[in-house]
Amino acid sequence: MHYSIIRKLVTAPKLANVPKRKWKSVVGLEVHAQIASASKLFSGSGTSFGAPLNSSVAYFDASIPGTLPVLNRKCVESGIKTSLALGCRVNEVSMFDRKHYFYADLPNGYQITQQRAALANDGKMTFPVITPGKKVYYKTAKLLQLQLEQDSGKSLHDDYLKRSLVDLNRAGLPLMELVFAPDLETGEEAASLVKELILILRRLQTCSCKMEEGALRVDANISIHQEGDPLGVRTEVKNIGSVRSISQAITYEINRQLETVANGGVITNETRNWDAENRRTVAMRDKEVLQDYRFMPEPNLPPLHVNLKPGSMSTEDLLSVAALSEEIPELPEDTRQRLVEQHNLNAETAIILVNEPILLDHFLSITRSLSDLPNKVICNFLINDLLTYCNKLNLDVEDCSIKADDLKDILMSLHAELINLQAARQLVDLLHNNPKAKVSELIELHSLQQICSPDEIENLCQLAIANQAKAVEQYQKGKAKALFAIAGEVAKLSSQKANMKLVVQRLEKLLKPTNK
């Protein structure tokens, strides 16, 4: 936000005629996270993204008569670990149900899910909300339930040949559905929740969270109402494909509903699609007629039992929640607290580092190697220089080819005053484009050494004084800021290589009234 979120959250276009009365927006999220598993939820077929069409399909996935589901133990473990990390109550017994509906890419005619008794309930997420230009604050959203379910296949529509094709590679992929209470109010809060969830799931290694591959899908339920009134009619927005789009889609939909009310219209209960190209929501289908999914118990799967006893161990046929809780790593908020308490970072810096795991890795690696280098100097360089450089290239930090050892060498050279900040920034660009090069070689090759020689500094200052006569006069009349113009002239004359600390010190001595 980068903060990696700050970079990615872009406010959606504002609409006209928004009512001026006090209205509140209410947002609830449903998140489908694909479990990181080598095989599907109820079959042994593979889960690789991008596999040839219909190449990862078991008989069960294609609904061949006589085939039965076999529950994937790894998926249950991942579901339990995720539930614990999100503060849920894991249920000792959960059950599977059939949810009936007809799609061409759902060969069974039903989806196996957990409607009546989910794997876990009653969790919550507390997360930092980062809004450009505003102070960071924390928000809490309740997690109503986390359930296991299978994904459907994928329909491919060929308009030219007027036909539809079905790819069943996705059919049966393992999903965790996380249903959050409508505790959010803005698009920024929703995007921040999803960003935090991504950080948690990646720490747990229970989901890749690659939204571009469909590994994490977000639906938003949005409504508006006047303060003190019951909740309004909600709309559901689907097809939100990125963290940035979550903020944009929800912000747009809130404004659309406000404008509709201002113009005397009525909000209808409908499903809308997010059109990322035109940055607007588009009506898909009504939800006014409640669809009957005819939920019924899944007869081919027994109730799922887990062991809730403290200190218990998992066995071949019974998973221990206590044992799985021992496998949960440090979570993002714990890392933020550690950075604040042990490394004396401020809260906002800690949030930025945790939001960008590669920056956090670089920071911890550098602090271990360069204990005498102030943490503030390291953070400033990583955030203000490396991150800014990546943002300008529209590049994720993890895709930047600069290694942690190279960053250490740059910071060591900077701290030793061998180079200045301008040269350090130049080295970032050079190393990204030449990842095999060494910092010392690049400094020599491009003559990036800082000018620290007293004689050279003296000559440069004298030239700058001669070139900036007006600024010199202003400075000697008491306008202290005029010194910046003279120092800037030195930087220009030295091709940004002069040690500016020494330059300022020398200029102050040269321009004292007694030195006229």
Swiss-Prot record:
Keyword vocabulary terms for this entry: ATP-binding, Ligase, Mitochondrion, Nucleotide-binding, Protein biosynthesis
EC number of this enzyme: 6.3.5.-
Reactions catalysed: L-glutamyl-tRNA(Gln) + L-glutamine + ATP + H2O = L-glutaminyl-tRNA(Gln) + L-glutamate + ADP + phosphate + H(+)
A cellular-component GO term for this protein: glutamyl-tRNA(Gln) amidotransferase complex
Subcellular location: Mitochondrion
Single Gene Ontology BP annotation: mitochondrial translation
EC class (word): ligase
Pfam families named in the record: GatB_N, GatB_Yqey
GO molecular function: ATP binding; glutaminyl-tRNA synthase (glutamine-hydrolyzing) activity
Subunit structure as annotated in this protein's UniProt entry: Subunit of the heterotrimeric GatCAB amidotransferase (AdT) complex, composed of A, B and C subunits.
Family: Belongs to the GatB/GatE family. GatB subfamily.
Protein name (database record): Glutamyl-tRNA(Gln) amidotransferase subunit B, mitochondrial
Organism: Drosophila melanogaster (Fruit fly)
